[in-house]
Amino acid sequence: DICLMMRSLYSAVSGLKTNQTAMDVIGNNVANVNTIGFKSSRVVFQDVYSQTLSAATAPTETSGGINPQQVGLGVTISAIGLNMTEGSMQPSSNTLDFAITGEGFFVIRGSDGAYYYTRNGAFTLDADGYLVTANGDYVMGVMGNADDVKNGMPLYDVDGNPIFDRIKIIGSIPTGETDIDGNPIYETYTDYAVDSNGAVTAINSIGEVLTIGRLVLATFNNTGGLEKAGNSYYSVTSNSGEAEIHFVNDGCGAIKSGYLE
């Protein structure tokens, strides 16, 4: 019967196609085994609807019940899910390498002006002293001195917009004060450090160690709903929920300098 043959061929082809997709996902997982901050994916299969050849019948006084007769019509993929569990930490020799112990993501501003989120904490400094990714994208935080920057301070303005900015670690940095003409006063800092709370400290021109800013982390209601955007970045989707911005160690995890996930 041609129809029966087509049905069997369709089921076989659907199995080949879905298993090829599964192999593609597994191959990508293996290829990225040494990619910093990479999160693996898994494929979940489900059967396609079945063709009912005969329906079930109830038992009667003269005969027993009969189960339905159904022929499956193949397989399809129900989900390709992200595994967002925390990865192992590997020590590095770079003090600007950071690993997150917890569920947070670093907040990155791309060259297109959009915000992205990553677990890849392999950072460096650019010529202006800003903390950047290997791609030159800015790592975001809140700039300010020890009195200005503290846990619990609002990270959003009255309209709900984030107030974080690029993190500048060395060089000439605004102090937050102004001179008599209203111009911002700058201070030159050197010898930076970043602690487990994301606090950035540096030494000013007279040798004082001051807190000049804080890194921030983002969390999401549904991390599985994030969309991979390349460069180990993730972007927000309608099913991830909006990013909730926190100071490091404020319910979203701490960071370890000199380690990578």
What residue spans do the PLM features occupy?
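Amphipathic alpha-helical polymerization modules
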Residues: 2-163, 174-261
